[in-house]
Amino acid sequence: MAVHHKRAGAHRGRGSKPGRGRGRKFETSRLKDVSEDNSSGDEERANVEPVEEPGDSEGSVVSSGSDLDDQPRENSYSTLLKLLNNDAKSNEPARKKRKIRPNEQHTSLSELPIPVEGDVDPGNELVDMEESEDEIIDDADSHLEDDIDGLVTDGRNDPFESHFGNPDESELSQKIEACSRRWRSIKSDLIDGLYAVACSPDVEQATSVVLPTTPTPVDLKLKRKLARSAISFDPLSTCLTPYIFGYRDTFFCSRTTQNSAKLRDIYCLHALNHVLKTRDRVIKNSAILSKEDGGDIELRDQGFTRPKVLIILPTRQACVRLVDSLTKLFPMEQQENKKRFMDSFSAADNDGWVNKTDDFKELFGGNDDDMFRLGLKFTRKSLKLFSQFYSSDIIIASPLGLRTAIEKEGGKKLENDFLSSIEMVIVDHADALIMQNWEHVEYIFSNLNLQPKEAHGCDFSRVRQWYLDGHAKFLRQTLVFSAFNTPELNALYNSQMQNAFGKAKIMPKYDGAILNLRLPISIKQTFSRFDSLSPLKDPEARFQYFTRTVLANLSRSWTETSSGKGKLGGTLIFIPSYLDFVRVRNHFANSSQTANISFGLISEYTSVQDSSKARSHFMNGRHSVLLYTERAHHFRRYNIRGVSNIIMYGLPDNPIFWGEVVEYLGTAPGGTTTTPTLRVLFSKWDALKLERIVGTARVRSMLLEKGGDTFTFV
């Protein structure tokens, strides 16, 4: 479980153990640790750069990443000059190319020659040298059926045609211009407590952005080969598929362990449908150009490079599940490098996790390495794993793995042209990516759909016009699936999801995590609101409120005993942010306000040995206070005993953590005479977190109430 904090340490590194950090161990005499000689040697050893596993070298881990260093370079401007010069030298007058619409019947399909799959895409100069004979399309009848299937369609009914194949240029121009000015939105209720906020660029005579449900998979415009193995629909599928298969940007904020497999099947089916339609169109048009000798026909059906779908996942095991879903929906006769893939990406679950929660097992089960990237190439009869990026149709990667493919050491750009023609981005388990390092995700999005620096063998005469105009980001579809919403995800939705055809945010209505506590006794839950002028000033306002109000009252009533556990001993302080954790830790170590308090520390950077020691001392009373971060809980899910009081310095992002942490109060020793207490600090900038804890019906009054700033639940 590699941990990467975006403000602490470098962005590189990987491993299978959690809680690694590059900072020195925090030491203070107030920790009252008698075994001071046992320093954080384990923590330092965890910081050593990992050794590559056998068979998992750059060529295999990176798969398609190794091709980024060795590609032939050609200046795209020089390529254009060559084309112009060749035309100028010709004695014959230039013929005007005739543009062929997708639904125009130019020639009989039965007259088309049988093209070669591996060579039909002029934009792919980096095809694999070991092309197999299976990539030759040797079945004319099969090819004819595929041409009819999905290519000769009514563009008004197929979202692929209206979005990518043949969009109305005038309407598209208006929508792109409106994207930077104003959006209009409509809110509608869905099923099971879900509701959608659908948005579209505000243009004249715009159609409604509320989409009807899709009753069955038959209503989807699928390739025939996919329709045969299409998934079954449940109520959630009928609500989501209109936005996903309609090429709208979609932000789904209710991902769970129960629906994650269904969501994965839905977006895999959509990605496959998009890739197959794109490749079949290129094959058909290449055949037309071959038949007509390419003289007077203009067919724009490509981007600058071949990769069309980017899927961002948190772990290698998640990648295994995704590839399994792809091959289930689109069975292939051959799967090249499958054994190599399973050996380097898959692993067995930990047998000692019987008591771990389902969300923990789903995320960290199997191979939880967060450093990987993989290219997938589809041919008629085979799927090739570990294909080079420039000859791949789908790229699957972790944020860290993809960033290291783009950057060199020192932040120097290495290569991002393979991201120039991405038409679909899928971010699954986004809440887990936030706990890794969200800055990597932001960096990847900043490198999408840029004009390429090199030609890469691109045939510019076949590049779609909106690519040449630099408008690809307005047609790219972005799908984000998360267990909950956060400010980081909201920022991504507002800044990077700029689909000219619209977008939708689908969210649940919360009952509140406070209603689902499993405690043997009832406890008083006190929420204290403090004033904060802006998100930037919120950390300072929170710290001042904590030290002057909460900690001051705590210190005055503290009664130390010889064992170090007094009246308010066994106090757990839960701190979501690591930077806030460092500030509170330093205050406990250096302030006279806490001079008589012994405390322990557990953060995501604390070694396993030191964490065990801190938990033991806290349970035995040698530490009166334990500082505990949200990311430490995310990666380790400790069961901390001896907790009599909880102070939440801030609300957790994950509502599951609320119940797990508050239920520590049920593990206090049976002889404890003090009544367990819970106090929570929040400001108006915590609205998203607060809604998940207290419920949608209560959050508004708690944020706007002017009669007081303290709210109590029993």
Curated annotation (Swiss-Prot):
Chaperone listed as a keyword: no
Family matches, as Pfam families: Utp25_C (PF06862), UTP25_NTPase-like (PF22916)
BP GO terms, sorted: maturation of SSU-rRNA from tricistronic rRNA transcript (SSU-rRNA, 5.8S rRNA, LSU-rRNA)
Origin superkingdom: Eukaryota
InterPro entries noted in UniProt: P-loop_NTPase, UTP25, UTP25_C, UTP25_NTPase-like
SUPFAM superfamilies: P-loop containing nucleoside triphosphate hydrolases
Main location: nucleus
Location of the region described as Disordered in the Swiss-Prot/TrEMBL record: 1-120
Keywords for this protein: Nucleus, Ribonucleoprotein, Ribosome biogenesis, rRNA processing
Protein location: Nucleus, Nucleolus
Gene Ontology CC annotations of this record: nucleolus; small-subunit processome
Residue ranges with Basic and acidic residues bias: 24-35
Compositional bias annotation for Basic residues: 1-23
Function (record text): DEAD-box RNA helicase-like protein required for pre-18S rRNA processing, specifically at sites A0, A1, and A2.
Quaternary context: Component of the ribosomal small subunit (SSU) processome composed of at least 40 protein subunits and snoRNA U3.
Family of the protein in this entry: Belongs to the UTP25 family.
Full protein name: U3 small nucleolar RNA-associated protein 25
Naturally occurring in which organism (per UniProt): Arthroderma otae (strain ATCC MYA-4605 / CBS 113480) (Microsporum canis)
Higher taxonomy: Eukaryota, Fungi, Dikarya, Ascomycota, Pezizomycotina
Gene (name only): UTP25
